Amino acid sequence: MKHRQWLIAVLVVFSLVVSACAAPAAPTDSGAGSDGGAAAPAGEMTFVGTPRNETLILDNLNGSLERPENFNPYTPGVEMGRGYHEICLDNLWDVDTVTGEQFPALAAEMPTPLNDDYTSFEIKLREGIYWDDGVEFTSDDVIFTLQTWMDTEALAIHGWAVDYIASFEAVDKYTVQFNTTRPQPRMAKDLGVTIWDNRFYPMAKHIWENQDPTTYEYFPPVCIGQYKFSKTDPNGNWTLWELRDDWERTSVGQITEKSGPKYILWNFVGTEEKRILAMIANDVDILQDITPESMEVLTQRSDVVRAWHAGFPYADFDDPCERGISFNNSEFPYDQWQVRWALALATDIKNVSLGTFAGMLRVSPLGVPPVAAVQKVYHKPLVERLQAMTLPDGYAPFDSSFVLDMAKIFQEQGVGGDLPATDAELIDLFGVGWWKYDTEQAAKLLEDVGFTRNADGKWLLPDGTPWSISINAPSDFEVQSGRLAYAVADSWSKFGIDASVKPMTANTFWTEQATGQFEAGSYWPGCAIGADIYPNLSGWHQKFIVPTGEPAPGNVNRHASDEIAAIMDELEKVTSNDPRNVELSSDLLMQMALEMHWIPMFGTSKFVPVNETYFTNYPTADNYYEGPWWWWSNFKFIVANIQPKQ
């Protein structure tokens, strides 16, 4: 706590100095409180030459880009989150983040099953949708995209497509018949958005038909959303988008009859300290991911900044993806369950929580996030099975004391008065429990598969060479995962492993995950938004495994399991509301936990503040028309509701 307070004090002093010297691109005194009272300053210009009060500025979540001119959504490592998939691309079906239900976007309605076994569907397209170059979006674009998937083996999506799709045809200009290789009752979830985005990015046939889809950069991109590409920084730090004159001819225009600000700028200003200072100086309207310490600085230095919650705990705890450590499970030694379990048991999860986000995290032993809706259906009901679960040697690894231990730690730090009073409420806050911190059992598991220790207590591989682990981590983006990597490396180092962290830019980080060219990584492959978890976990099927070095259509961890595959094959056949769905999904999660297919650790706590100097009506906990998912595909619908300060 003392270190935290010291850091805040330093940042506050630093912010006073920098804001006093701030460039005139944006005012440091907004003249308005968080209630949106006074009008925004007029006449100010941004550094890209647009009126500040007409330009919504977002922090670029994934930092500086290595290939800023690559807009091909089907290439490994492409940066989707700089406005590209949020407001330029669009989807057949998107998701309402309040209800978790899908709705038709580019499609005119949800798909219609044409038979009782869910192998044939009719897809009706919304009429009057146009690409920003004036060409109408029709079934020709859908057919062209699907055919490109099927014909191009070098695309990562190809493996999934040939397994899933039997045939397709254009019935007319706005109707497609889509046939699957086997029953697919969740077809809209398989091709549409359930969380962040989807598989299906329509390709404009008139642009792509003479291009190689594996190498074409699609620059400048032709957009189907309500914004069009304006310009991008060749150094990869910013991208500017401009509202289309014909925004009514988009899904957002037709559905909401609204558009959004005239300009939207995604800008990466650098380190977290610089990002915080930019918001204090009113040079950024939306920050996408900061630390608890930085949130405290903002609340102290600005009266026009607020987070999801106006006060403590500020963050939204229900991001539908969880954080932890992934491995390439096809490569030695991570292909052995004993090694993965040893690393889990050698992780001091309480210290990792404190070192990552000051303990403000909800723990998860299962392969789906502990968001309220998911924890209610899976984490809480499965506690008894977790307690009864044993490894092959009879060892019971589950520890339900995490909640009380964390409460005690906070009480010792003098902040226990802010905690809930009951055990049930503490579980809602901190989670149901995790695995024991048991280095003796971890050592036993390693020794069982030939690992040894040298005289200094350092672990050696079975061939006698030193064991080192390099953990891929986001550099200057996705701060929770970046911090988690260092905290985990610290635990493993104390256990005698030469563990280190390898910070990476977004392009390299995601490319190495897709191609399996990593041994360990602070990734987040466990996502779900409700009881129907199969659509978000189906990619773990072993049929999607490809050799290391090739982009994977799914199962980037390359985890092979006949048991998991068998449960998934059954899950694929049932509908979302079938009672067997939760039963089979529970079995799937328990099997994944037993195999330790990756090491899930925490739900994601998102500190995503907004600045109300120039714009208002952001979604918040008390204005809950959408979640604070600025980096999701449905941001195009959120931004249509964000209003300029009048």
Where would I find each of the regions flagged by the language model?
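Aromatic- and charge-enriched surface segment that lines or borders ligand/interaction sites
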Residues: 109-155, 171, 177-179, 275-278, ...
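Aromatic-rich, solvent-exposed beta-strand/loop patch
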Residues: 108-116, 132, 161, 179-202, ...
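Gly/Pro-rich hinge or "lid" segments in bacterial periplasmic/extracellular proteins
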Residues: 78, 86-89, 94-101, 194-265, ...
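Surface-exposed binding/hinge segments that line
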Residues: 124, 158-209, 226-228, 233, ...
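Extracellular/periplasmic solute-recognition and catalytic clefts
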Residues: 149, 156, 167-168, 230-242, ...
